[in-house]
Amino acid sequence: MTGETEADLSGAEPSRNRRRPKAPIMEIDGRRLKPATLMMGHGYDPTLSEGSLKPPIFLTSTFAFDSAAAGKRHFEGVTGIRPGGAEGLVYSRFNGPNQEICEDRLSVWEEAEDALLFSSGMSAIATTLLALVQPGDVIVHSAPLYAATESLIGRILGKFGVQWLDFPAGATEKEIGAVIEKAKGLGRVALLYLESPANPTNVLVDLEAVVAQRDSLFAGEDLVPPIAIDNTFLGPLWHKPIAHGADLVIYSLTKYAGGHSDLVAGGVLGSNALINAIRLMRNTIGTILDPHSAWMLLRSLETLELRMSRAGENAAKVCAWLKEQPQVEKVVYLGFPETARQADIYRRHCTGAGSTFSLYLKGGEAEAFAFLDALKIAKLAVSLGGTETLASHPAAMTHLSVPAERKKALAISDNMVRISIGCEDADDLIADFAQALRQIG
């Protein structure tokens, strides 16, 4: 839209609608600032908040307009008449200062054009799917997915005529292409949805292969399905999917980004065009994150690199010890690729192995439960990415609703324990796992 057209829409000039923060400092003497530095102040100007070093928490449901024309202009953005969302603050279902500052900082990690905050990881996923998928469309996804995501696609969207096909997380480019080609025969392929590494098996998806097959099979077509990837297990430190061709990156920000097991949040990062479509859906159904949780996320992002680095170092030491124990069948950890193909995917995509892994014990559910019940430092709880170490039993907990035959096909077995290593002392964690393993022989 031209400047003249925009002025004609509302009769208000853009420059008068809102006090703007100072221009962000992204580089000094030609040196581009790192995300860890930008997390301390990017997107926030203290002079707009009485000099407060940290952003206040804006606990308000609505915002006053400078003029009626300014209000009209803001609503043109909120309703999609003007691309890019509201230029000013309107109503807390649409936007707010805490959310906008946090969204700006999230974008920094992957050099994304834009980002959105949501009330949970699942609300981020659901809002994205509702924005991009229509009745009769087809979704192609990697498998396994987080159980709630599988339920959303198969059980809920399925009721509205949405079909899906999947391929195993470790599939080759040829296998991925065959599934996409089959999906094209069923209807409009609206979305390629990935989760890497897969939850809870820790198998990596070859994102670059998915991009190559998508670009080849849809070359010259008007409608090219975007690729969305759930990067919760590795991002934003150890894997940056946008750099490898993903269009959207989805997070449960509850995990590493929040990092203290004291908030629930989700996020989506990507191009302006796709984020605009998702923003309109978020505005409609009200899945935005609340101001207090957004403020807590800002706090957490300041220490994200420190926490993830420490947890990753701990996990490497703990996994090296675990794999040598007689009670352990195997440890599925990205630092120990099981196949040459997984090693190749890891080399091309990842900068670190993460701190969440799958531990397969010798035995079954009884042995897994005995191990979990004996833990003294690690907490028996679902989730991951917090400062504390967590352990859970996917088959009986997060993936309980998955049919038995599908769990078997996806290697979600009764002897599997999922562990997320935290920031404790690594040797203390090893001592805890050692005494717990003794409970099963």
Model-identified regions with their sequence ranges:
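N-terminal glycine-rich, Lys/His-bearing helix-loop that initiates the first secondary-structure elements
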Residues: M1-A86
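Glycine-rich beta-alpha junction loops
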Residues: Y44-P46, L59-D66, F233-G235, K255, ...
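Conserved PLP-enzyme active-site core in the AAT-like
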Residues: D8-G30, M39-L48, D114-Q327, V332
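Conserved N-terminal alpha-helix of the aminotransferase class I/II PLP-enzyme fold
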Residues: T62, S67-S123, A148-T149, I153-R155
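Conserved C-terminal alpha-helix-loop-beta "cap" of PLP-dependent enzymes
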Residues: A23, K330-V417, I421, L429
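PLP-dependent enzyme catalytic core of the Aspartate aminotransferase-like
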Residues: T2-K22, E113, G154, Q163-L165, ...
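Acidic-histidine catalytic/liganding microenvironments
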Residues: W109, L322-P326, L375
